[in-house]
Amino acid sequence: MGFVGEGLGGRSERSDEQPLVMTNSRLSDWPALPAMLEQNASHFGARAALLSDGDEPLSHQQLWDQAAMTVPSLNRLGVGRGDRVAIVLPQGPNLAVTFLAVAAGATAAPLNPAYVGKEFLFYLEDLQARALILPKGSDSPARAAADSLGTPVIELVPGKNGAERFHLSGVARPLEARAGLAEADDVALVLHTSGTTSRPKMVPLTHRNLLASVRHIGATLQLQPTDRCLNVMPLFHIHGLVACVLASLGAGGSTVCTRAFGAEKFPGWLGHWKPSWYSAVPTMHQAILAHARARPIQPLRSSLRFIRSSSAALPPPVMAGLEEAFGVAVIESYGMTEAAHQMASNPLPPRTRKPGSVGLAAGPDVAILDEAGKTLASGRMGEVAIRGPNVTRGYANNPEANATTFSDGWFRTGDQGYFDGEGYLFITDRLKELINRGGEKIAPREIDEVLLAYPGVRQAVTFAVPHPSLGENIAAAVVLKDGAVGCEAVLREFALDRLPTFKVPSRIILVKDVPKGPTGKIQRIGLADRLAAALVVAYEAPTSDMERLVAATICQVLGREVVGRNDNFFSLGGDSLRATQVLTRLGQSLGFQIPVPAIFRCPTPALLANKLDLMREPEVDALAAELEKLPPEERASLLNDL
């Protein structure tokens, strides 16, 4: 039993004999990004292309002018077509413009600015970057990494006519690559995607790949020049770059480039910018929904035409809650870097949207394959595979991965799933061991290696644990060497000094031995269940007013009735967004600002209270003294109200 889809949003016909291959053959009209930008400048001229708080809008004409001006500058600095340029810039409009301008004449490789020095060193070396672009005067650890590798640094200098206009400053070098504007089969973008080993894979995407995806997304969402996307996604990931920026521009529309996500800012953004849509990962949607439920959102409903979700599974209750709160359809989709983002998507109303499904094929051909590579019929479980104009031609410098991932023209995603009788795709599991932390794919072995570097650790196994908002969070089981001394707090400190905070395990448990499978191999999948008892923390009541204040604040933010002094904030359901809320409320109560890293280094009420006691100002000490004079019942009531 199977179905054959006809294009984007086409009808499906039943076939009881044929295997299921959802098909789409629509290609991009532009050969490369420069052609798209130039055509937009001609057609839409002074209409806004990119917007942001505190800056003048950048028009389609200005965006093309910036790209056309940047390419000769890159050539003068020794960078041309095919040269990889690492970009480390803060989130916001300059990052979007720089990506487009660099891709117009070279290969853009945006990197997460939160990386530590060792990571920058790896990525710059793996990329064989021809140059690194940094903001003028930046002290990012990327600069030191580039210096150690001899990679030239190009500084982004704001122009005089607006923060979105800039020029490049660096040392002129001979141009070894081809000069001028990029063409269809040039690589426009390189991103790394984590694998089950500690070495990430490099994914090159051509202009043809990106623009095919732009057209696929535009057709799926029926994007028009009047549409405006509110982008809350980071622009060093495929989701933000392609779905939120390129797809909007491809339709002649506009994108609002926010500088940092905040659920509390979202109603203001809706009211001010009046976007017709936004796309985000489930973690962000959950934070937005929680904030929307806390205040009336009805006056803001009219601007949104739909809401889009991708990069991780969206829980059906969150989907239903968003639709109720905002009064528009939520469109869940399925994407990955190797596909230049979109592979499948639920359609817009009035067509059927199925909670729990990532929808119909929406771009490339999508099939379910068995282990031998045979295409399976609907209802049969197997590995999701894709092929089409948006799919990368292969990982760079990784023949082993290409040999196992590409087969008979299909790219095997590593995800397990099936099509139902109507051609809707359901993802049931990941065949790989990646931890999907709110859409951020994290390789567990990378964290293993950091923990194994601690002198007293004999074995470390990182694995996924369920998390109510992120979907999955990170935990690690550690076996100490005989006679070695260590504890969770010490190991977390060790990891925090060597990893970005989003890669540090929320729990590190000490065990005598890590459970193994029948063959004696470590099986990461299922470790959370097998170590469930060890992950449980026995309740212990807070013992000081500061601990009670911290515990009460965590209760309020997470909606819990009780929090013990040794309960880990992140294990209870906390994430970086809620961490900011906790610290903001505590700062308001205590009268001083608390740095965000504090809760990552001190994730329990006991540890955080001790940290706050050390940070307190004299007037806070006086307040604490006054609290101590109150009767216990009155003091507890007051603290609960904080």
What are these regions (language model features)?
Residues 45-46, 160, 173-192, 198-199, ...:
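Conserved pre-ATP/AMP-binding loop-to-beta segment of ANL
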Residues 360-363, 374-405, 424, 442, ...:
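Conserved ATP/PPi-binding loop(s) of AMP-dependent carboxylate-activating enzymes
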Residues 57-61, 181, 188-215:
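Conserved AMP-binding A3 loop
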Residues 28-29, 38, 46-92, 96-100, ...:
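Conserved AMP-binding/adenylate-forming core of the ANL superfamily
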Residues 19-23, 515-519, 524-567:
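Acidic/polar alpha-helix N-cap and adjacent early helical turns
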Residues 275-280, 289-353, 365-367, 372:
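Gly/Ser/Thr-rich phosphate-binding loop
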Residues 115, 278, 388, 393-394, ...:
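AMP-binding/adenylate-forming catalytic core of the ANL superfamily
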Residues 103, 211-228, 238-276, 287, ...:
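Conserved AMP-binding/adenylation subdomain of ANL enzymes
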